[in-house]
Amino acid sequence: MTALSRQIVAVVPAAGVGSRMQADKPKQYLHIHGKTILEHTVGALLTYPPVKYVILAIAEDDPYIRRLPLVRDARIQIVVGGETRAESVLNGLKAIEHPARVQVMVHDAARPCITHEDLDKLLRINDENGAILALPAVDTIKRADKNQQISRTEDRNFIWLAQTPQCFRAEVLCHALERALAQGLNITDEASAMESAGFRPHLVTGRSDNIKVTRPEDLALAEFYLSQRTNRENTNK
């Protein structure tokens, strides 16, 4: 069964509060061009034809999600998120019917600039190891000690910066996350859970504009990238 012969489902963990953003609401609900970041992100997934539906993992006491028009879309399913990203993703995976037949794309709620071209590249990988978008490191990488002094310089030829989406067979990822959480491992993305289970996910070169809005200065950058994309689309019409 090829990746495209499987049902493609997106899971978006959106239960975080984004404390580094220093805003009065979670970062996924900040606005760019009249829409929340979450709406831009989910819109990019819903307009990608292979995606059957999108599962949003939302904080149980989230007061914002029901105000958004996207919740009325029949292709949106909402589940309660967990205390960590891994738990939120796992809750989303458990909501998938027939997971053995599903290829899941897990995507950050605060990455609104994802392109369909990058999604195409991910789906070209068809084995049980799965694949993630990532960028080869271009800066010199320093490893620090506990005093924030340099302990050594890493070989950047082997360093990649992980992005999302991260794409795996839903059933395999579900088992990997359950196992990692049971072992108390520090799981910061889905690939790390797969690695802990013995898999070796593929690295697919992504784009530098697929940024995660994390700090205040990122908001203006995401706004710029989305504006540029809109301008190109209007020019090509």
Swiss-Prot record:
| Keyword Nucleotidyltransferase found | yes
**Site positions (Transition state stabilizer):** 20, 27
Pathway given for this chain reads:
Isoprenoid biosynthesis; isopentenyl diphosphate biosynthesis via DXP pathway; isopentenyl diphosphate from 1-deoxy-D-xylulose 5-phosphate: step 2/6
SUPFAM superfamilies referenced in this protein's UniProt entry, alphabetically = Nucleotide-diphospho-sugar transferases
* Record has DNA-binding as a keyword: no
Q: Gene3D superfamilies from the xrefs? A: Spore Coat Polysaccharide Biosynthesis Protein SpsA, Chain A (3.90.550.10)
Note the site residues: Positions MEP for the nucleophilic attack. 156, 212
Q: Which CDD domains match?
A: CDP-ME_synthetase (cd02516)
Per its UniProt entry, which superkingdom is the organism in? Bacteria
Q: What family is this? A: Belongs to the IspD/TarI cytidylyltransferase family. IspD subfamily.
Name of protein: 2-C-methyl-D-erythritol 4-phosphate cytidylyltransferase
Species the sequence originates in: Actinobacillus succinogenes (strain ATCC 55618 / DSM 22257 / CCUG 43843 / 130Z)
Q: Which gene encodes it?
A: ispD
